[in-house]
């Protein structure tokens, strides 16, 4: 099983169509070889597209778009908790080869991991009766998130141009921005710097180390609760956090 998440968490990056096609072509070719082998199981692609409805512009590409032959080996996961800003509503869906979906349903029924029935019915009715409104909501949310992302990234570029030890990576979708704060390297532990930002600056971020990264300095900042109403306040908070970090680190005795 090969797993891909696009747009990705925490970076918000969308997989390049040519790269995705290359992966799909290899999977198809591998399965053609396995078809002639006794007791050989297929190689599947698990494609997590939970942030797809929040991708900016035309960046998002599903494996089917670039390699129709992958259909027999593709398992796609999606849901509404991200696109509707309803992270507490864990209702999603999977589509893929019939035998695989059947096995997944059996396992879920045994461990009792179904989404609450009331929420399933509510979502089904909502999509049936309010599909146009849902699409309008998505258009509004994507435009809002893209605008906010550009503004936040612009603030980090401004700070970077002034010589502060920061960097960023502009997202292509989702609700997160990747930021780099070199100041963390002056702290004994990443957690110490996070505590400083929360307690002294009012800024909460998540280090990439929590996602398995070995590189110290990169963090994920969420824009899920940012709107045009509080954007200026958030930008000031970011600037003050960076300036306080700079002052503190420069005053440290090594």
Positions of the model-derived regions?
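Helix-loop "lid/cap" segments that line or gate small-molecule binding pockets
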Residues: 93-95, 121-130
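Conserved glycine-rich beta-strand-loop-beta hairpin in the small C-terminal domain of fold type I
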Residues: 120, 124, 138-153, 165-181, ...
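PLP-dependent enzyme catalytic core of the Aspartate aminotransferase-like
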Residues: 24, 186-187, 196-205, 211-254
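Active-site phosphate-binding strand-loop segment of PLP-dependent enzymes
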Residues: 1-58, 249
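Structural signature of PLP-dependent enzymes
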Residues: 104-111, 129-153, 186-187
């Amino acid at each position: 099983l090969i797993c891909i998440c696009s747009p990705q968490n925490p970076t918000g990056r969308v997989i390049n169509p040519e790269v995705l096609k290359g992966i799909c072509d290899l999977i198809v070719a591998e399965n053609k070889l396995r078809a002639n082998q006794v007791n050989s199981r297929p190689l599947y692609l698990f494609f997590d597209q939970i942030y797809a409805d929040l991708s900016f512009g035309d960046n998002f590409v599903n494996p089917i778009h670039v390699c129709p032959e992958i259909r027999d080996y593709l398992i796609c996961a999606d849901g509404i908790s991200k696109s509707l800003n309803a992270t507490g509503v864990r209702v999603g869906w999977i589509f893929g080869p019939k035998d695989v979906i059947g096995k997944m349903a059996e396992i879920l029924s045994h461990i009792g991991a179904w989404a609450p029935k009331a929420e399933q019915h509510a979502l089904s009715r909502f999509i049936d009766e309010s599909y146009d409104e849902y699409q309008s909501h998505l258009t509004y949310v994507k435009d809002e998130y893209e605008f906010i992302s550009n503004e936040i990234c612009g603030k980090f570029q401004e700070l970077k141009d002034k010589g502060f030890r920061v960097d960023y990576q502009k997202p292509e979708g989702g609700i997160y921005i990747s930021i780099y704060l070199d100041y963390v390297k002056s702290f004994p532990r990443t957690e110490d710097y996070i505590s400083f930002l929360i307690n002294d600056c009012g800024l909460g971020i998540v280090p990439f180390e929590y996602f398995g990264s070995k590189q110290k300095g990169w963090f994920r900042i969420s824009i899920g609760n940012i709107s045009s109403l509080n954007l200026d306040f958030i930008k000031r908070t970011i600037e003050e956090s960076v300036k306080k970090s700079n002052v503190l680190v420069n005053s440290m005795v090594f």
